[in-house]
């Protein structure tokens, strides 16, 4: 399995193809944000979640 999941730039759907099968748009690698134990924005995210 050498393929990685990709996300369409136009419609936001996920696929393994270079071109979106739904809208025909360009797809980009869907790379998640890097995890850091020393999360500098964790405090703000928890405050926003609390409301």
Curated annotation (Swiss-Prot):
One GO molecular-function entry: snoRNA binding
The keyword rRNA-binding belongs to this UniProt entry's keyword annotation: no
Keyword Ribonucleoprotein: yes
InterPro entries: H/ACA_rnp_Nop10 (IPR007264), H/ACA_rnp_Nop10_sf (IPR036756), Nop10_arc-typ (IPR023532)
Keywords: Ribonucleoprotein, Ribosome biogenesis, rRNA processing
Cystine pairings recorded for this chain: none
GO cellular component, as recorded: ribonucleoprotein complex
One GO biological process term: rRNA processing
NCBIfam families, per database record: PRK13130.1 (NF009623)
Protein family per UniProt: Belongs to the NOP10 family.
Function: Involved in ribosome biogenesis; more specifically in 18S rRNA pseudouridylation and in cleavage of pre-rRNA.
Protein name: Ribosome biogenesis protein Nop10
Organism placement in taxonomy: Archaea, Methanobacteriati, Methanobacteriota, Stenosarchaea group, Methanomicrobia
